[in-house]
Amino acid sequence: MTFNEQPTGTTGALSPLIYQAYDANYTQAGFYYQFEIYVWSGTTTLPITPIVTIDRKPDQFGGGRGWIDAHKIAAQYITTDFLVNGTYKPNIGDGAYYVAVKVQGIYDSGSTAQITSNTQLVTGGWNYTIDGLNADYSAKYVYTDKPAVYITANTTEYYLWYDATQITTIGIAAYTTTPNAVSTSDTKIQGIDVMQLITAAGTSGEDYPIVFSYSGGSVSIPIQYQCQNKYGEVDIHFLNKYGVYDSFVFNALSRKTINITREQYNQPIYKQADLNTAWSYGVQITTPYHTNGIEQIVVNTDYLPQAYNEVMKQLQFSQNILMVEGSDVYSVRITDTAYTEKTIVNDKLIQYTFTLEYNQPVINKIVR
């Protein structure tokens, strides 16, 4: 049997996870391909029982091949609440799971040998169509596409994530720290709070790069302190294409609005004790109900280099955004439906504006 499978690296479960099988016995009576899909956390050892078994008849228009796409099954297990704000060195936890597939051909008079695929780690990330089929993140050591980290003296937290099976130390200036111990799927990808690392290194206010070292090389990302604007900054963490919470500081004008919704009911005026009371100006004849509001905030970036366009595009596609307000963290989403990529040639100075909408109403009516 020929089995086209996923590579062994890490990839996103929001894009197709295609597995394709072909066996010359597909012309046998009653032939079908049986795919067993495994999604689990822990060590790389496959569980005894698959999550689901899918039988596929050979595709007569595809030369007798059979295929499945496992991404929707895997995505059901991946969570987006793995980041506990304030953690110095967080693990990805349930934000990543292992996926593997077994396949064999079964027909009336027999069956083929069962083949087991590679084991792949999947996150809540995605791949662009132009990346090709079954793309993965094997070439990435640090899971961000930002060319630099921009912060202010008032930034409280800022996360970068990396492949903890490859990175050996993370450092600023002469100070270094090491990843948490890696043993299972929930620790293979880890993060670092840049602000706490800066404090530990004693380099607050200084533009030292953060360096992620691995065997045979390193990844260096510049850190630049910017003057905070008079409006106050808006800090967010957003799920990027790699399925981890990338951070960004909106260090320009921001403005909040609340869109209020309500219904109303006109009561009969004769419900009062007497007509004089009924005709009083203080009587609430028109009564509002189901009153609530959705809060939005319009945020603006500071001037950015053109190399930041990919980060802004990933923010637009993000499946979840966390906005930090003091000690509170709110889930928000972008309501803009169009993204215009800006360039130095066309726009000279590059700034972006986004409208963020809170994912919970102003008045607590979440429990139905």
Please report, for each region that a protein language model flagged, where it lies by residue.
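Extracellular/virion structural assembly segments
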Residues: T2-N4, T8-A13, A24, Y159, ...
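Preference for solvent-exposed, low-hydrophobicity sequence contexts
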Residues: M1-N229
